[in-house]
């Protein structure tokens, strides 16, 4: 098992790659909330934990928090991000 960090910026269609978006815009959602991402991960069966009062390194002035997720070593992070967005769009 490994632990990965997911910031809302990774899934935000309004952000550029330079600002932290990790997947293509077509797959992203507009302004995803940490709570929605957390709920999506729980629906997908992942063990997740919200960490509040943290700033994304590219937006150090904005306190948003992130999510820690425990996943199997063989699952790529981008695969999980795509699944989250699919779930959020439903």
UniProtKB/Swiss-Prot annotation:
Keyword Cytoplasm assigned: yes
Any one GO molecular function term: 7S RNA binding
InterPro entries: Signal_recog_particle_SRP19, SRP19-like_sf, SRP19_arc-type
Protein's cellular compartments: Cytoplasm
Keyword RNA-binding: yes
One GO cellular component term noted in the UniProt record for this chain: signal recognition particle
Function per UniProt: Involved in targeting and insertion of nascent membrane proteins into the cytoplasmic membrane. Binds directly to 7S RNA and mediates binding of the 54 kDa subunit of the SRP.
Subunit structure: Part of the signal recognition particle protein translocation system, which is composed of SRP and FtsY. Archaeal SRP consists of a 7S RNA molecule of 300 nucleotides and two protein subunits: SRP54 and SRP19.
Family stated for the protein in its record: Belongs to the SRP19 family.
Protein name per UniProt: Signal recognition particle 19 kDa protein
Gene: srp19
């Amino acid at each position: 098992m490994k632990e990965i960090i997911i910031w809302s910026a990774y899934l935000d269609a309004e952000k550029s790659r330079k600002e932290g978006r990790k997947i293509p815009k077509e797959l992203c959602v507009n302004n995803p909330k940490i709570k929605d991402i957390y709920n999506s991960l729980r629906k997908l069966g992942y063990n997740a934990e919200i960490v509040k009062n943290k700033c994304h390194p590219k937006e150090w002035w904005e306190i948003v928090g992130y999510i820690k997720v425990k996943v199997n070593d063989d699952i790529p992070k981008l695969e999980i991000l795509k699944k989250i967005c699919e779930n959020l769009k439903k």
